Structures are given as C-alpha cells and as structure tokens.
Amino acid sequence: EQPVTVEFEPVESEYPITIPFEAGVGVEREIKLSDIADSVQYVPLETNDKCLIDFINSGKVVKTGKYWFVSSNTRLYQYTTDGKFVRNIGSRGGGPGQFNYFQQIDVNEDTGLIFMLTTSGKINVYEMETGKFLYDIKIPDKETAQFAMLNDTLVATFMLNSSGQQKE
C-alpha cells in the first residue's frame, strides 16, 4: 500500500481573513490557575529507551480524550492519559511520512487523525490508533510557523514575516 500525496487547489472565497493582532498587544492581565481549573493532576510519563524525552518545546503538548501527545522538534511521543507509552509517531528521514524536523501538531479526535507540520513544506497525516502514515498535504508557503486544521482538508496558518519586507 503506497502513501498518497494530496495537493489541494485554492478555492476562491473571502479568504484570507486578516486578524488585527496588534489590537491585543499590550493588553495583559493576570489569571489565577483557580480561575480556569478546579484541580491539577500530575501524570508521570513512562520512561524507557523508546521514550526518553530530551526536551519539550513550548506549547507542544496536546491532550485528547484517550492520549497525550508530547513533542520535541524531532520526535512525537504518544502516551495514554495515565502516562503509559504507546508509540513514537513518524520518524526522521526523507521518505513518505518522514521528516527532518516538525514545528507543531494538531489532532482531530472525531476522525482519529494526527496532523504534523514539518519543516519541508507539508503536513504529514497519521492515524491516531496505529501511528500509520496516511498521506501528506503540501502547504504553499514554507514560512508557515503555526497551523490549525479546520477540517481534514482546510488549514489555517500563521506565517512569520521573517524578512520584514512581506506586505501580505
């Protein structure tokens, strides 16, 4: 069974939508943990040779109803909600379903899909229950820094203006 590469044609619509982030800059307020949570639970993660986590990138932990997904730039670890190691998702390399580095993940519990934004201009898609690579989605701009899947084919992205010259 061969992996599939999916390329989507842009759809004419009212997109892109510009969100005025500058309006929120400088508007800070202190929030107590008790304002947003009733309790705190510590979950010790299983440690063995397959799941030695060297570091966790900021904002790179995702919890679903059944799993925790913990990521560094080079590995995505899957754990049960009680901390038992399940598997690593994907692997480093240049083949189908592989990556050199990845920036972020998103998970759709309803469809059981894991979406991984790689640094090579694509989003790898894996099956949550098996870790199997299914297909990848090419993204038009390699400068994409963050993303969210709106459905299985529609992606919202945030692109860095690293040169300071880009207007759109």
Model-derived segments and spans:
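Blade/loop signatures of beta-propeller domains
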Residues: 3-42
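Residue-level detector of Asp-centered blade-edge/turn motifs that repeat once per structural unit
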Residues: 63-65, 107-111, 149-152
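Asp-box/WD-like beta-propeller blade repeats and closely related beta-sheet repeat scaffolds
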Residues: 101, 117-167
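Conserved beta-propeller blade signature
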Residues: 67-70, 113-115, 154-156
